[in-house]
């Protein structure tokens, strides 16, 4: 898998933005990606050094349309901790 296929998008919420002060960033990643693949992709795309990585599989929520029941898609979140000497990831500092 290519690095740009592994990292889907940053997750920008109030909680994730509070963690950026401690050099922790949250991304939505491909559900099939492993921790070593995610670490390599982050280091390759953003040119930083990753010191820690946590992942969480999030189930899809149940949604209804009348009597029909379906689910939203499941996703995997990766919380990346950068080393002290790494630069910040710029997409989180805009706005």
From Swiss-Prot:
Q: Which SUPFAM superfamilies match?
A: Ribosomal proteins S24e, L23 and L15e
Q: Name one GO cellular component term.
A: ribonucleoprotein complex
Q: Which UniProt keywords apply?
A: Ribonucleoprotein, Ribosomal protein, RNA-binding, rRNA-binding
Q: Which PROSITE patterns match?
A: RIBOSOMAL_L23 (PS00050)
Q: Which residues form the signal peptide?
A: none
**UniProt GO MF annotations:** rRNA binding; structural constituent of ribosome
Q: Which InterPro entries match?
A: Nucleotide-bd_a/b_plait_sf, Ribosomal_uL23-like, Ribosomal_uL23/eL15/eS24_sf, Ribosomal_uL23_CS
One GO term (biological process): translation
Q: Which NCBIfam families does this entry report, sorted A to Z?
A: PRK05738.2-4
According to the record's subunit comment, the protein's assembly and interactions are: Part of the 50S ribosomal subunit. Contacts protein L29, and trigger factor when it is bound to the ribosome.
HAMAP family of this UniProt entry?
Answer: Ribosomal_uL23_B
Q: Main role?
A: One of the early assembly proteins it binds 23S rRNA. One of the proteins that surrounds the polypeptide exit tunnel on the outside of the ribosome. Forms the main docking site for trigger factor binding to the ribosome.
- Report the family membership: Belongs to the universal ribosomal protein uL23 family.
Q: Which PANTHER family match?
A: 60S RIBOSOMAL PROTEIN L23A
Q: What is this protein called?
A: Large ribosomal subunit protein uL23
Which species? Leuconostoc mesenteroides subsp. mesenteroides (strain ATCC 8293 / DSM 20343 / BCRC 11652 / CCM 1803 / JCM 6124 / NCDO 523 / NBRC 100496 / NCIMB 8023 / NCTC 12954 / NRRL B-1118 / 37Y)
Gene this protein is translated from: rplW
